[in-house]
Amino acid sequence: MTTETTGAVSAAVSGQDTLQKFIFDNAAVRGQFIDVSHTWQEVVSRHAYPTAVKKVLGEMVAAAALLSANLKFNGSIIMQIHGDGPVRLMVVECDSDLRLRATAKLDPDATIPDVATVPQLLNATGKGRFIIIYSTAHYPPIAPATCRVRQPWDWRLSCLRRCR
């Protein structure tokens, strides 16, 4: 998406997706409208998700795009829900250029009704987790090990001393 600014309103466009920012001059109010229909159709065309899963995943896509649009960073926002219901995992990633991707992993044996709620989908036994990862482009995802292993039994101790 690219951003164009005109006065108190700016818009971002990617294909047919739009992000519209607005500010009221006489009030301390600002906001955004987002339409990610084009990207969303791409996501759901690749998987046969149940209606309830599409709804929650769509809300996550919109939330990730809005969050990324409001932060000034070079990297990506990753939103993950690890569920203990019929939906095991939902992941949405939006980078600083507002490029999106999303997926869900479902329990293959579960039957999901069209009107299932978020707790029914993702938090059936109270062990669901929601995680937001703020990843900058310049931070390496894995730090290289700088310690040497002399003996099989002392590698942990050696790494603890030298890699702190």
PLM feature segments, named:
Residues 2-20:
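N-terminal low-complexity or simple alpha-helical regulatory segments
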Residues 115-164:
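Intrinsically disordered, low-complexity regions enriched in acidic/Ser/Thr/Pro/Gln residues
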Residues 14-135:
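N-terminal functional module of multi-domain proteins
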